[in-house]
Amino acid sequence: MDQECIENYAKVNGIYIYYKLCKAPEEKAKLMTMHGGPGMSHDYLLSLRDMTKEGITVLFYDQFGCGRSEEPDQSKFTIDYGVEEAEALRSKLFGNEKVFLMGSSYGGALALAYAVKYQDHLKGLIVSGGLSSVPLTVKEMNRLIDELPAKYRDAIKKYGSSGSYENPEYQEAVNYFYHQHLLRSEDWPPEVLKSLEYAERRNVYRIMNGPNEFTITGTIKDWDITDKISAIKIPTLITVGEYDEVTPNVARVIHEKIAGSELHVFRDCSHLTMWEDREGYNKLLSDFILKHL
């Protein structure tokens, strides 16, 4: 699996950040990826390695305090810090070379924030199930909860309002929500499970996000850069699943703000479209990249 991938650590802003660089045999472009969470790991994005066959070298990394990377002081658990970390890593590995940037979920928020500041270092931007506003995303997730079968909706509201996140009925309802809106598959790939395990084990998810995907009580809860993203002028592709927990309405706001951006809704998919339609997803991304070399 990893014969064409190099794993290593880079010292970034005083801490060691893990990365995996999967090189294309005949490289045409470089793609830097940003995982979600905040607090997951790069593992669930590994399906994107398939794009090396199209001449696209893919960089994966575990953000600060995530996966295999070291944790900075918790005062640095911010999106701004994540932007500077990404820029330092890009510069360290690729120098002045422009790359494509893809962010998934929270990584899409991070990628938008990066592009607002550093789009001169990018050839193009891909936002996959990403967001420009946490409050809007939470509002949309609450709408999805309201549309759940009564048994699950009531359990989420009853136990969520009292913070009883460990209650078995609440956990069952969360699991149901995830299988509708996170990954619509009975058997979840080991790469996805590994990322979820890291989120559970490390501190970032709990501190920056909160107890679960739709209960965002952490430090990012008020984050919103919707009014800044119209400054992004590079080629931009926005993807979202039809049943995505970060809904098509959230994606449309980004699409409307970034002039000339493309929006693609994956039918019958939810949040982790890279697994639900692996072939179609990788083709869409590689076609976009190769079109904007």
Swiss-Prot record:
Broad class of enzyme this protein falls into: hydrolase
Catalytic activities: Release of N-terminal proline from a peptide
Keyword annotations: Aminopeptidase, Hydrolase, Protease
GO biological process: proteolysis
Domain of life the protein comes from: Archaea
GO molecular function, one term: aminopeptidase activity
Function: Cleaves H-Pro-AMC as well as a wide spectrum of amino acid substrates and several peptide substrates without a proline at the N-terminus. Proteases F1, F2 and F3 degrade oligopeptides produced by Tricorn (themselves probably produced by the proteasome) yielding free amino acids.
Subunit structure: Part of the tricorn proteolytic complex.
Family that this chain belongs to: Belongs to the peptidase S33 family.
Name recorded for this polypeptide: Proline iminopeptidase
